[in-house]
Amino acid sequence: MSRLEQRFAELKAEGRSALVTFVTAGDPGYDASLQILKGLPAAGADVIELGMPFTDPMADGVAIQLATLRALEAGQTLAKTLQMVREFRVDNQTTPIVLMGYYNPIHRFGVEPFVAEAKAAGVDGLIIVDLPPEHDAELATPAQAAGIDFIRLTTPTTDDARLPRVLERSSGFVYYVSVAGVTGAGSATTEHVTEAIARLRRHTDLPISVGFGIRTPEQAANIARLADGVVVGSALVDKIAQAKSADQAVNDVLSLCSALAEGVRGARR
């Protein structure tokens, strides 16, 4: 059983949703970013998505684009992102880490060495936003062969004809993007999310995590009543942007994570 399967199974047994947090690797700098990464589980993160900075993050809203820019300016590379995961795993062998980003940096790194190093570092899953199922052979197949889950994004515009193709080789969990557009934009209605989850469940047994537009503990709790996972990214990344120092960035991100976790954990009581 993979770490992701294990975590979602444990939470299902507890009768609660997972808090899935997104931060960009290397934002605001390597050391502070590593501190945030290491602090997230104790602050209540059940699964961590770690963004791999790339110069052209087309699916991301302004907050995550700026985070990517800060990380790249601070010297973050894909090799350093894998190093962060290695350092995280020294103290934590249970919290799943999913790398999220675009195919270009992986292609440049080399798929074979990337998959081998990601597995050795302790990466559990990949979300690659610009690789559709038609390109499975490039990365999804070798990653899954190495025991790394490949997580697909589905959106309100993924129709019933397309959905089986998208979900066919998915593993780990399904990431439902509740608002069509870029990250951090708007938020979906509870009714919309309820219908979307019901539709996805007709096609897959995988846990369903809902993200995009969730910013407050209240919003997180509302989604946690419906979905297997609640993904929060831009709201955490904004705390880094607003911080006056690296220490403040660490503290503010972890404080918000704790508040979100409280919302998620109390949602079904």
Swiss-Prot record:
Catalysed reactions, as listed in the record: (1S,2R)-1-C-(indol-3-yl)glycerol 3-phosphate + L-serine = D-glyceraldehyde 3-phosphate + L-tryptophan + H2O
EC number of the protein: 4.2.1.20
Subunit structure: Tetramer of two alpha and two beta chains.
InterPro entries: Aldolase_TIM (IPR013785), RibuloseP-bd_barrel (IPR011060), Trp_synthase_alpha_AS (IPR018204), Trp_synthase_suA (IPR002028)
Naturally occurring in which organism (per UniProt): Pseudomonas putida (strain GB-1)
Domain of life, per lineage: Bacteria
Pathway in which the depicted protein is active: Amino-acid biosynthesis; L-tryptophan biosynthesis; L-tryptophan from chorismate: step 5/5
Name of this chain's protein: Tryptophan synthase alpha chain
